[in-house]
Curated annotation (Swiss-Prot):
Record-given protein name: Centrosomal protein of 41 kDa A
Organism: Xenopus laevis (African clawed frog)
Purpose of the protein: Required during ciliogenesis for tubulin glutamylation in cilium. Probably acts by participating in the transport of tubulin polyglutamylases between the basal body and the cilium.
Any matching Pfam family: Rhodanese
Recorded GO CC terms: centriole; centrosome; ciliary basal body; cilium; cytoplasm
Cystine connections: none
Family matches, as InterPro entries: CEP41 (IPR051889), Rhodanese-like_dom (IPR001763), Rhodanese-like_dom_sf (IPR036873)
Record flagged with keyword Protein transport: yes
PANTHER family linked: CENTROSOMAL PROTEIN OF 41 KDA
Gene encoding the protein: cep41-a
Length: 365
């Protein structure tokens, strides 16, 4: 007798669905909860925009954390220059602005030297984490506690601050007084003149190769200073990581690198943080067809302006982009909380129906 044959082709389940490149960029409508697609997209985003390496000597600061720092520094400077903030309030801000404990600060140091007893805390310590959703809710990335202290002066309520008229050009030409961070652009001068973050100073990586006076007076002033940090950035972390490693090897302990550089800024903060036109390497490739690309004209290259402060329009755009980024990252967690809350009443009602005969029902567990 012949063996029993199965109906149909046994290889039908291994057949792949043909993909059309024309519709690869189109996403599904249902995009809630955790899925393998989101996980793979997150991994691809990390590989595309970041260059993580093992045993990095320097620390990282996220673009969103840097944007919060910019907003808080601008708010404090505005209050100070308007005369509404007294000297005692500023002293309380400095005394109560520590976020990380002595033990955490010791572990975050690049070389792990020193002890908690003889090392002073820096009021600004931001560590980039691989889990961006959880980092938003932690005290490390919440700059309200850095600037506002324990509540003596609440500067986080942006709605209560009245936005004045645009500052004059002379006011934008001056850097922020007593700024807690020094922003350094480690690219060459031509790239700096094309596009850079407002308030950044040009410090090419070739300066580190000098045998005499490799550091500027501003860098020496901020080097390992209490309550001050140095932030390096470039386009895609290629140059900034080398410069940060070299400076950490030379004794810089308050050094941070801006994760992603201008490439991530162009995606999350296309307006407000920078001046000038973004480099072509930082812009995302278009998803249009060839015929549409031929018809669309190229945007003119605008050189960067020589301004050291953010205008009120820049701060408003930064705040809007920051809210959009934080809302997009916190949406899955809120959906999970809503789903949990929606399940509780149904379970409680079923428990009450089962114990309706008794006068006092037991709580649901």
């Amino acid at each position: 007798m012949s063996a029993k044959r199965s109906i149909g082709d046994s290889e039908i389940l291994k057949k792949r669905i043909p993909q059309n490149q024309k519709y690869e960029h189109i996403k599904t409508r249902l995009d809630t909860g955790n899925s393998m697609t989101k996980y793979l997209e997150r991994i691809e985003d990390i590989k595309r925009n970041y260059r993580y390496k093992k045993d990095e000597l320097f620390k990282r600061i996220k673009v969103t954390t840097f944007a919060q720092l910019v907003l808080q520094v601008a708010s404090v400077t505005e209050e100070r220059e308007s005369g509404e903030m007294t000297t005692d309030e500023l002293q309380r801000l400095e005394d109560n602005s520590s976020v990380i404990s002595d033990t955490e600060f010791l572990t975050d140091r690049p070389n792990g030297k020193g002890s908690p007893a003889n090392e002073s805390n820096s009021p600004i310590q931001f560590i980039d984490s691989e889990r961006g959703e959880e980092l938003i809710q932690t005290s490390r990335s919440t700059l309200q506690s850095v600037i506002s202290g324990v509540g003596e002066l609440d500067l986080g309520n942006q709605a209560d601050i009245k936005k004045e008229s645009l500052p004059s050009s002379s006011a934008l030409d001056k850097p922020y007084e007593d700024c807690p961070f020094l922003l350094l652009d480690v690219r060459d001068r031509d790239s700096y003149d094309q596009c850079h973050i407002v308030g950044a100073r040009n410090y090419p990586i070739a300066m580190l190769s000098r045998t005499m006076n490799p550091f500027t007076p501003e860098i020496l002033e901020y080097r390992n200073a209490h309550g001050k940090i140095i932030i390096l950035y470039d386009e895609d972390e290629r140059v900034a990581s080398q410069a940060a490693s070299t400076m950490c090897e030379r004794g810089f302990e308050n050094l941070f690198m801006l994760s992603g550089g201008l490439k991530v800024i162009s995606q999350r903060f296309p307006q407000g943080l920078t001046t000038g036109s973004f480099p072509i390497t930082c812009l995302a490739p278009p998803t249009q067809t060839k015929s549409a690309l031929k018809r669309t004209p190229k945007d003119p290259i605008i050189p960067a302006e020589n301004k050291w402060r953010f205008s009120s329009q820049d701060l408003e755009m930064i705040e809007n982009h920051l809210e959009n980024v934080l809302m997009s990252t916190s949406t899955p967690s809120r959906l999970r909380m809503d789903s949990r809350n929606s399940k509780v009443p149904s379970s409680a009602s079923s428990a009450r129906s089962q114990s309706s005969t008794s006068s006092h029902s037991k709580p649901w567990k």
